[in-house]
Amino acid sequence: MPAFYGGKLTTFEDDEKESEYGYVRKVSGPVVVADGMAGAAMYELVRVGHDNLIGEIIRLEGDSATIQVYEETAGLTVNDPVLRTHKPLSVELGPGILGNIFDGIQRPLKTIAKRSGDVYIPRGVSVPALDKDCLWEFQPKDFVEGDTITGGDLYATVFENSLMQHHVALPPDAMGKITYLAPAGQYSLKDTVLELEFQGVKKSFTMLQTWPVRTPRPVASKLAADTPLLTGQRVLDALFPSVLGGTCAIPGAFGCGKTVISQALSKYSNSDAVVYVGCGERGNEMAEVLMDFPQLTMTLPDGREESVMKRTTLVANTSNMPVAAREASIYTGITIAEYFRDMGYNVSMMADSTSRWAEALREISGRLAEMPADSGYPAYLAARLASFYERAGKVKCLGGPERNGSVTIVGAVSPPGGDFSDPVTSATLSIVQVFWGLDKKLAQRKHFPSVNWLISYSKYSTALESFYEKFDSDFIDIRTKAREVLQREDDLNEIVQLVGKDALAEGDKITLETAKLLREDYLAQNAFTPYDKFCPFYKSVWMMRNIIHFYNLANQAVERGAGMDGQKISYSLIKHRLGDLFYRLVSQKFEDPAEGEDVLVGKFKKLHDDLTSGFRNLEDETR
């Protein structure tokens, strides 16, 4: 007689062979060791125990396998069955991904909530990632029966929503001659829409693909990125730009605004699709995204307003979910991003935060009794981070028609105590090309985004020079001057603390005042106002141009302006006589982009001309 355990028979399923099963020998938190697993493969997906918990093999030794389980392991006992699936951890890719919210192993949270009627995910729940019964409007492209088709070719278009066209591609590892292509109509993800014959073997395809998450999707070639990622944040777009296909890190202590910057990028960046991965962060942050995004709209070039959620996919793996699934959530997110990249879209992926993933690696590494490296993190931490960040880039996609796509990765890092020498931060900085360092002191002064302009950097400035030359030939010189002013202010601050502001030369007083203008009225930005939540690039350029124009004119006036009685033009005189122009400089940020580019550029040009004439009149009066 089979033994009972917890009301369940400890027998094997009728349709499974006994050789497909191992049995649990040891349970240690999320790590399970199973015996009788001869023939299993690394990173093979397994089902552990009577609840069919999802796990992944991470070490093989003899016929025993070490498994990291992606669900709560409470209640597992020795000799519980472990079922092998003979396939790696994979994600389902097809229509229905956008606007959805998944957990770390691509289980749809809305569907689970409806089925279980509970706020928590039941253990061992098995729900298909995408709705197989939903009908999609299928429109085949210019292929006919008898045509040859290869991996990556786009053979149909599906209307996913009013913002995104979903292109259906042949999986990268398939090829052959078309024997059947479904006519235009409505089909579900179960329906066969394409049949191929290759070397006498027929194979049928639906609109759905599965892809192992740890394997990067193949591309024809990698390209040099040359288009900026415009975020709508002045400090990032003007001083530390990234590119479409770049890698960025946002390290910062708690309360510095990492999540707000990540969300601003998701809302306002010039990406076609966004994958937002909440990896080990607070559940409230994902709830905030879920509440905010459906109400947020973006204005399309044709004037239509569309919900941001229509281009967004959320992967939620909050801090109270099992730690092992944090690693899976990062890989799930990047695989979904690569899928949209292969359609020819520019995709942004936000990972908030990679430090929590590294902590999960540390915990599992400790349970495996591996040799710890710096701060207890495993020695392979840098290699794992690199394998993730290297999946970013601008690429030429496989198959036809010829198209380019890109994946931009923005990883938030939460170093304990804001210490940038933390192993995760230093390993990340050795890989990424853009560093947006957040400063606790700026955040405490309520200066947001709290990006420290003295320690941040971007290695893409040279790659973007051709774009800037086309957009505005003066911009590179203006930006260099603005950086010099901010750096000079930092040097002068020590002198000011010793001798006071009044003892400085007139030129230094102008430098300090211009730096204050740049800091408070240019770099600082209020994300909760209609006029400043998003700043178009033309507005950023004109605001900086006018501030630097004021700086140059003031310096020239001070140098040239000796009066008849030897009275020089001082900074206090400039501020007293040109107070209204100074006020207009401060108020540039209040110009609302909703008025349109032509109106705003006209206002900024008028201020530029008024500054020139104002200083000319001042010099004439004091001669």
Curated annotation (Swiss-Prot):
Instruction: Describe the reaction catalysed, as an equation.
Output: ATP + H2O + 4 H(+)(in) = ADP + phosphate + 5 H(+)(out)
Family listed: Belongs to the ATPase alpha/beta chains family.
Cellular component GO terms, alphabetical: proton-transporting V-type ATPase, V1 domain
| Residue intervals passing through the bilayer | none
Q: Which Enzyme Commission numbers does its entry carry?
A: 7.1.2.2
Q: What class of enzyme is it?
A: translocase
Molecular function GO labels: ATP binding; ATP hydrolysis activity; proton-transporting ATPase activity, rotational mechanism
Q: Which InterPro entries match?
A: ATP-synt_VA_C (IPR055190), ATP-synth_a_Xtn (IPR031686), ATP_synth_asu-like_sf (IPR023366), ATPase_a/bsu_AS (IPR020003), ATPase_F1/V1/A1_a/bsu_N (IPR004100), ATPase_F1/V1/A1_a/bsu_N_sf (IPR036121), ATPase_F1/V1/A1_a/bsu_nucl-bd (IPR000194), ATPase_F1/V1_b/a_C (IPR024034)
Instruction: Write out the residues that bind ATP.
Output: G252, A253, F254, G255, C256, G257, K258, T259
The record's HAMAP family line, in alphabetical order, gives: ATP_synth_A_arch
| Gene Ontology BP terms | ATP metabolic process
Question: Out of the domains of life, which is the source?
Answer: Eukaryota
Give the UniProt keywords, A-Z.
Answer: ATP-binding, Hydrogen ion transport, Ion transport, Nucleotide-binding, Translocase, Transport
PANTHER family from the UniProt entry: H(+)-TRANSPORTING TWO-SECTOR ATPASE, V-TYPE PROTON ATPASE CATALYTIC SUBUNIT A
User: What Pfam families does the record tag this protein with?
Assistant: ATP-synt_ab, ATP-synt_ab_N, ATP-synt_ab_Xtn, ATP-synt_VA_C
Summarize the protein's role: Catalytic subunit of the peripheral V1 complex of vacuolar ATPase. V-ATPase vacuolar ATPase is responsible for acidifying a variety of intracellular compartments in eukaryotic cells.
Q: What is this protein called?
A: V-type proton ATPase catalytic subunit A
Subunit (UniProt): V-ATPase is a heteromultimeric enzyme composed of a peripheral catalytic V1 complex (main components: subunits A, B, C, D, E, and F) attached to an integral membrane V0 proton pore complex (main component: the proteolipid protein).
SUPFAM superfamilies in the record: C-terminal domain of alpha and beta subunits of F1 ATP synthase (SSF47917), N-terminal domain of alpha and beta subunits of F1 ATP synthase (SSF50615), P-loop containing nucleoside triphosphate hydrolases (SSF52540)
Coiled-coil spans in chain: none
Xref: NCBIfam families: PRK04192.1, V-ATPase_V1_A
